Amino acid sequence: MQELKKLPVGFENFQEIRKLDFYYVDKTKLVEQLLENWSKVNLFTRPRRFGKTLNMSMLKSFFEIGTDTALFDGLYISQNEELCKEYMGKYPVIFLSLKGVDGLTFEEARSALCELIAGEVRRFKFLLNSSRLDHDEKNIYRDLISLQGEQETTLATKLKFSLKKISELLYQHYGQKTIVLIDEYDVPLDKAFQHGYYREMVALIRGLFGEALKTNDFLQFAVLTGCLRVSKESIFTGLNNFKVYSADDVRYDEEFGFTNEEVKKLLEDYNLQKHFTEVKEWYDGYRFGNADIYCPWDVINYVDDLVSEAKSQPKAYWINSSGNDLVKRFIDMADKTTKDEIEQLVVGEAVEKRIRLDLTYDEIDNSIDNLWSVLFTTGYLTKNGDVENGMYRLIIPNKEVREVFLLQIRDWFDQVVANDHASTEKINRGFLEGKTDDIQQELTMFLGETISVLDTKARNEEKEIFYHGILIGILKNYSGWAVKSNRESGDGYADILLKPKNPDVGIVIELKYAHSMNELDKACERAMEQIKNHRYDAELREDGRNDLLAYGIAFCKKRCKVVVEKL
């Protein structure tokens, strides 16, 4: 039996993956497409964890002088012998990943950027011994190795011209223009916005990119990647022959993320074909250009788990690899209309929106419409069908992302409940005192505020679980009792048992879903019969609690009916 290749979980270095013989999904067609389409500066925007860094590493390995050409043996690009002969290993390459450029202050972030650039410059120490560089040029190189410790204006100038200078020195040495690869170009802007120095970072990046990409006679071409397409006016002012390829573009639509065929092949290679449906439900659903795309981070992680443990279940790998503050901000800002639209999304329906692909970070929170756009570009939403008149039909792509929305909706509702002390107190006192009108009134108010996650096609049991979660969220905020959920009692499981501080008192609650408002009364009757027939009060009586109230609560959409009986 052929030994299975190791899966590259967490590996983003192409050379490392190939030399260690890890499994590699061939994306080398990207090289061919770049050279055929030819733009001086190319920006690819895709959600995080969609293979951007690995693709950039692959480009570096292909073009850089001195590359090991055997890395590409057997891959798609090796079939194009003429292209490989002309371009493989023929260029100096500058490769920067800006994902680590962060700091609580602008000075800290700038220092991180200086060290990053200096670290890349140190790869070219052979320039110090180059016969093609004169004394002054070698001194310029020495300055670039250490960009720190200068006066403010000197440091700013050196940093601004650093990439242009090193590409000029590389040209002097090789007689060949430089390829510049900048991965995660927008991370410093995102961090700067979060920490309050956005304008300073925009000015820094604009200056650096302007010199490296716009007025650089020693540039062959550049490739940048990021999550957001920051508006050209803020960063890329004046760049000619500048192309942006977003998730909406047909060109390069299969080069980031896995296609259906690639996922099938991967599962076949590990004899896991039977898991295809669940992989598709959980990790597919992204529509890039004309292609249906899976999140590669998820697929690789899940296959790796299955190889280790055959009974592994799908997990939210992509979601757990970063925070999900964006969805939280979106829900926090939602008005009644937006809450209704979120309900549509969560139950699998589409919402039509006009999307802006060129926002700046400081515009994101200006309006709920801008957040719709960012949710699309960052992968929390995807398009369903063709774009018509600038309007996108947006859907949640898969089960994994739906889990994020559900989690954030629950957290948001918990916060709503925690902040409304008067209503929760009224509900809780109502349960203790048998005041069904108070309970019904306040519960209906909360139901009106919440975001329903109920699919109309869901089974009654699933709908009851939803309302059960809402009621538990309200009851657990009251310190006056212990809340027991789905506890075995008598001949079955009671939905909710409440044990107040008074040791003589106990409360049993049974929930039912009604298909129409006319059925609420009958649903309450069924709930009450179930409490009695299955002796749900047994656990409470065993505790010595004999002053018992039983509640039957029926729900229909955002209305409810409450009845009570003394047991």
PLM segments and residue spans:
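Walker A/P-loop-proximal flanking segment of P-loop NTPase domains
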Residues: 1-80
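Conserved P-loop NTPase mechanochemical-coupling segment
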Residues: 9-18, 108, 112-160, 188-193
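P-loop NTPase motor core
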Residues: 61-126
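Substrate-engagement module of ASCE P-loop NTPases
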Residues: 121, 162-173, 200-220, 536-539
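Structural recognition of the conserved hydrophobic beta-strand(s) that form the central parallel beta-sheet
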Residues: 179-183, 207, 220-227
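Amphipathic alpha-helical segments of the small helical/lid subdomains adjacent to P-loop NTPase cores
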Residues: 232-237, 245-304, 341, 346
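Extended alpha-helical interface modules used as scaffolds for assembling large macromolecular complexes
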Residues: 242, 294-535, 560-567
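Domain-level recognition of nuclease-like catalytic cores that cleave nucleotide substrates
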Residues: 539, 543-567
